[in-house]
Regions:
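Short, structured beta-strand segments at or near domain termini in extracellular proteins/domains
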Residues: 110-130
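Intrinsic-disorder/low-complexity loop/linker signature
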Residues: 6, 11-12, 18, 82, ...
């Protein structure tokens, strides 16, 4: 879905959203990429998992739960209260496509696809603003 919001500023704001199914792969040879339909200024992706209490607590407890990119950054940032996990997810934007991969994560190999936001069989949702 792409929406061109007619705000009273020159050019307005663009919004798009969607979802994808994780494949279980990770690393530079297996990047994730999303065509958002316009040159984004902000991109946010999160695991579609409400948690056991239904409160979507991935912001504070789960480093594999979401990522944020804003114009001027070169990485998809982890948003997490867990200071023991460090993720490096290089991210680039080429035209309308946002791409990222996990280049390092201090976790067991079986967890790395999740840290790339590409866990097998998991649904991820995303939105972009431009």
């Amino acid at each position: 879905m792409i929406i061109n919001a007619g705000l009273p500023i020159a050019g307005g704001v663009r919004f798009s959203s969607g979802s994808y199914q994780g494949t279980g792969t990770h690393g530079a040879d297996n990047p994730c990429s999303i065509n958002v339909g316009f040159a984004p200024k902000l991109f946010f992706v999160f695991r579609d998992d409400p948690g056991s209490d239904g409160k979507c607590d991935f912001f504070v407890t789960e480093p594999a739960g979401c990522g944020l990119w804003v114009v001027g950054r070169d990485a998809l940032l982890a948003i997490s209260g867990n200071s023991n996990t460090r993720l490096t997810r290089p991210c680039n934007v080429s035209g309308t496509v946002v791409g990222w991969y996990l280049s390092y994560g201090n976790a067991a190999d079986y967890m790395l696809a999740g840290y790339q936001l590409n866990d097998s069989g998991t649904t991820y949702r995303w939105f972009a603003l431009g």
